Amino acid sequence: MEIAVFGGGAWGRALAFAFGEKNEVKIISRRDLNEPLKKLNDALISKGSAPIEQVDLERGLKAALYVIAISVQHLREWFQNASLPKNAKVLIASKGIEVLNKAFVSEIAKDFIDPNALCFLAGPSFAAEIIQGLPCALVIHSNNQALALEFANKTPSFIRAYAQQDIIGGEIAGAYKNVIAIAGGVCDGLKLGNSAKASLLSRGLVEMQRFGAFFGGKTETFLGLSGAGDLFLTANSILSRNYRVGLGLAQNKPLEVVLEELGEVAEGVKTTNAIVEIARKYGIYTPIASELALLLKGKSVLESMNDLIRRA
């Protein structure tokens, strides 16, 4: 089966490689991917799979299934420009909350596609590990279980993909863990110790679940791969962009400098502000996100972390 992956960043390329084991994959990106795809295609060909082919948007839209790995902040614009066919089957692999409209991913997508044709990818994974073929377990959330299973069955041998409902819980967990991951990086950067880190992540998980429950997310989603699993991975690894943002802030570097040095998108930065504004609107208690928002605006890192540990 032919699958189109939209987005040529590290995550998009990793997903193209993963789906390429069993399927013909077309990737659509504004950047030239000839060099980045070379090693991935060599690996696919060695396994007897077809190489990933970069194509234009018109050609990509002819695929049977779509995987979208576009930054959440540009997702609405992408949908507007792409003009997906009415029968599109979509798996969104972007994690975050749209800052401009304070919208979750599914809220953006429903303006352009049938909600029953939408899936959301969640769970603990890094692009750098997927392209090495290292094993992981992910969750495909959808109100349409048949479609979720269809996508799950297309994943490679090294990925265990579960099909679950609760799409709102899955996408909130995927967005919120990036916020806690920044705080986790700060905690480690300040060398506050394992006990403080455990407290931070435990309370972060509770905060994530509290926020998600307000919008109908299920507790089991936040305690599973989509929530706890992704949180524990992202908040503890140097492979995490958001964790590295926290490490940079712990060195008293201005946020602008941290992001410039990162050279990649860290969705947790903008997601933090979106969560705080949504929480304020609905009266949801989010002490970690609220304190982190102050830190991102320039509050002293030591003062912020001390206040955070006491409040959370």
UniProtKB/Swiss-Prot annotation:
Gene Ontology biological process: carbohydrate metabolic process; glycerol-3-phosphate biosynthetic process; glycerol-3-phosphate catabolic process; glycerophospholipid metabolic process; phospholipid biosynthetic process
Species, as recorded: Helicobacter pylori (strain J99 / ATCC 700824) (Campylobacter pylori J99)
Matches recorded under Gene3D superfamilies: N-(1-d-carboxylethyl)-l-norvaline Dehydrogenase, domain 2, NAD(P)-binding Rossmann-like Domain
The keyword Zinc belongs to this UniProt entry's keyword annotation: no
Residue positions of the active site: K177 (proton acceptor)
Similarity comment text for this entry: Belongs to the NAD-dependent glycerol-3-phosphate dehydrogenase family.
Protein name: Glycerol-3-phosphate dehydrogenase [NAD(P)+]
Annotated NADPH binding sites: W11, R30, R31, K95, A127, R241, V265, E267
Amino-acid biosynthesis listed as a keyword: no
Superkingdom of origin organism: Bacteria
Function of the protein: Catalyzes the reduction of the glycolytic intermediate dihydroxyacetone phosphate (DHAP) to sn-glycerol 3-phosphate (G3P), the key precursor for phospholipid synthesis.
